[in-house]
């Protein structure tokens, strides 16, 4: 599996930001996914940053999805920006994903995010939606 997280500039609302998570089956075999892909903020020292996570049934309840090779499933993430100098602000330069645990998976490819050397991804909290078979409504909550 690979994951791409695409920043959604049209979904900016105050300090709230959104990303479209695209989970793609890169194997030669059909697989099933259900629920959500855990997303973690990671810093330049390759450490998972502690960010409060909330799970939301958005845009609806999770359903089993069968992914043939090359096919994708989608989920939305929403996070609240914070000031790097705040003690409760998570600061990182990349994101990881995991389908089996809540942290420490492979790196996601980021599109539209700050350059990694800037360590400019800030998160006070993050909400993760459910995996869906299409992009419809995935970042509309």
Features from the language model and the residues they span:
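Low-complexity, acidic Ser/Thr/Pro/Gly-rich terminal tails and inter-domain linkers that flank the onset
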Residues: 1-13, 137
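Extracellular/mature segments of secreted proteins
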Residues: 3-7, 39-41, 89, 97
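Short, solvent-exposed loop/turn segments enriched in Ser/Thr/Gly
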Residues: 14-20, 90
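Asparagine-centered strand-capping/turn motif at beta-strand->loop junctions
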Residues: 21-28
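Short beta-strands and strand-coil junctions in structured, solvent-facing domains, enriched
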Residues: 28-30, 82-85
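Short acidic, flexible loop segments centered on an aromatic residue
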Residues: 33-48
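Intrinsically disordered, low-complexity Pro/Gly/Ser/Thr-rich segments with frequent PxxP/GP/PP motifs
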Residues: 52-82
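Extracellularly exposed regions in secreted/surface proteins, prominently low-complexity, repeat-rich
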Residues: 72-74, 81, 87-141
């Amino acid at each position: 599996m690979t994951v791409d997280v695409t920043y959604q500039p049209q979904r900016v609302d105050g300090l709230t930001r959104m990303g479209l998570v695209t989970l793609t089956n890169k194997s030669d075999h059909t697989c099933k996914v259900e629920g959500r892909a855990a997303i973690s903020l990671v810093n330049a020292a390759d450490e998972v940053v502690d960010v409060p996570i909330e799970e939301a049934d958005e845009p609806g309840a999770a359903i089993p999805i069968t992914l043939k090779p090359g096919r994708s499933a989608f989920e939305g993430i929403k996070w609240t920006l914070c000031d790097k100098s705040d003690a409760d602000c998570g600061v990182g330069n990349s994101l990881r994903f995991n389908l089996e645990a809540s942290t420490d998976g492979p790196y996601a490819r980021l599109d539209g995010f700050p350059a990694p050397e800037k360590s400019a991804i800030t998160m006070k909290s993050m909400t993760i939606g459910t995996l869906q078979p299409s992009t419809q409504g995935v970042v509309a909550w």
